[in-house]
């Protein structure tokens, strides 16, 4: 299931050179993307017990999650992260909540692995499983946002998450936990033998790093203006989502598998005015790996990428490699992809069992 229209300023193609019916289709897709809207209520995380500091002892995730839950149960509004440094564990978004980081707000995620349990339902490299809690996660929520001019820092480095990829140049040493020690192969075997998803319980010892932001079966989503740094794994991972806007976001993460934004089996997506400076693909379109992708058979479709800058990464706009559910209607316009650090501008990854 393939239909792609890629139009990049890099290639010197003028808007007028492309058949107008193609642009009209992208305009119709954009009209289908629902916009978030929130009541005027504001919930400051300090009012729920969040304290500034980065000494490794004071964690703010309980206060932040309480503020989010209270806001959602009251009908929605804005959960405010004021200026200052806040050390936190995993955050769970709820419907009708805008998590807003004011300029000067610095949300730093701890690398203490025990904080990211119990596991949650997700996908890891296109395979369904229960894995470590993403740093920011939502399941089945609607009308949610992460906005503001603050910084969200996963604090991943060779000293913690990145070494789990199993590569010595990312800090791995013999005897350390790593995905190559059997965890990744175990997950792939679960999928190929059609093991029930609730039996696919991955643990820290399996070495499968969590995403920075993972939104699962959510709709009407906005991620705007924030800076995202140092992700353990993929940075923005919408999964089975619909009506997503990613606007004005700066991504800076040079670890292994630090994809910038990976819409997976998602529909009606706009990514615009963003800067991607990554250790892997800047944007990668996905729809599941092998058996799991074919089982759900949900393509990624109606995706618009425009006015973005790809400064570093394996590929600017990439399809795959986990693309077994197919993809269609991908529009790329006026993106700057001329950095000497960018390996490829457009890349389609495929093989005979995965699609693409």
What residue spans do the PLM features occupy?
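Bacterial N-terminal signal peptides that target proteins for export
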Residues: 1-2
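Extracellular "leader-to-stem" segments immediately downstream of a signal peptide or signal-anchor
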Residues: 6-8, 12-217, 222-224, 233, ...
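Short, solvent-exposed loop/turn segments at secondary-structure boundaries
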Residues: 55-59, 294-297, 319
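Short glycine/acidic-rich loop motifs that flank beta-strands on beta-rich extracellular proteins
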Residues: 76, 89-90, 110-112, 132, ...
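Catalytic metal-binding/acid-base residues of hydrolase active sites
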Residues: 86, 151, 336, 351-352
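Right-handed parallel beta-helix
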Residues: 103-104, 142-150, 219-229, 242-253, ...
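Short, contiguous acidic/charged loop-to-helix segments that flank catalytic cores in large enzymes
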Residues: 320-323, 349-356
């Amino acid at each position: 299931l393939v239909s792609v229209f890629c139009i990049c300023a890099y290639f010197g193609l003028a808007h007028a050179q492309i058949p107008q019916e193609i642009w009209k289709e992208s305009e119709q897709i954009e009209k289908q993307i629902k916009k978030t809207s929130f009541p005027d209520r504001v919930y400051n995380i300090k009012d729920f017990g969040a304290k500034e500091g980065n000494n490794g002892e004071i964690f703010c995730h309980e206060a932040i999650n309480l503020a989010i839950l209270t806001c959602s149960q009251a009908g929605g509004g804005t959960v405010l992260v004021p200026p200052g440094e806040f050390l936190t564990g995993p955050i769970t978004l709820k419907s009708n909540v805008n998590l807003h980081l004011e300029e000067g707000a610095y949300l730093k995620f701890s690398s203490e692995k025990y904080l990211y349990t119990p596991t949650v339902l997700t996908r890891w490299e296109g395979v369904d499983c229960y894995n470590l809690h993403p740093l920011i996660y939502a399941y089945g929520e609607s009308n949610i946002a992460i906005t503001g001019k603050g910084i969200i820092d996963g604090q991943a480095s060779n000293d913690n998450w990145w070494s789990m990829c199993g590569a010595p140049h990312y800090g791995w040493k013999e005897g350390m936990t790593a995905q190559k020690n059997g965890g990744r192969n175990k997950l792939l075997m679960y999928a190929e033998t059609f093991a029930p998803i609730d039996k696919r319980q991955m643990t820290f010892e399996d070495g499968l790093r969590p995403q920075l932001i993972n939104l699962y079966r959510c709709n009407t989503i906005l991620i705007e203006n924030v800076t995202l740094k140092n992700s353990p794994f993929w940075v923005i991972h919408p999964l089975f989502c619909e009506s997503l806007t990613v606007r004005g976001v700066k991504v800076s993460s040079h670890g292994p598998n630090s994809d910038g934004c990976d819409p997976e089996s998602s529909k009606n997506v706009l990514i615009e005015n963003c800067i991607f400076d990554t250790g892997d693909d800047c944007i990668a379109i996905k729809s599941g790996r092998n058996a799991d992708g074919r089982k759900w058979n949900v393509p990624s479709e109606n995706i618009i990428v425009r006015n973005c800058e790809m400064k570093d990464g394996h590929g600017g706009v990439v399809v795959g490699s986990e693309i077994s559910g197919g993809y269609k209607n991908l529009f790329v316009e006026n993106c700057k992809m001329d950095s000497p650090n960018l390996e490829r501008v457009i890349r389609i990854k495929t093989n005979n069992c995965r699609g693409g």
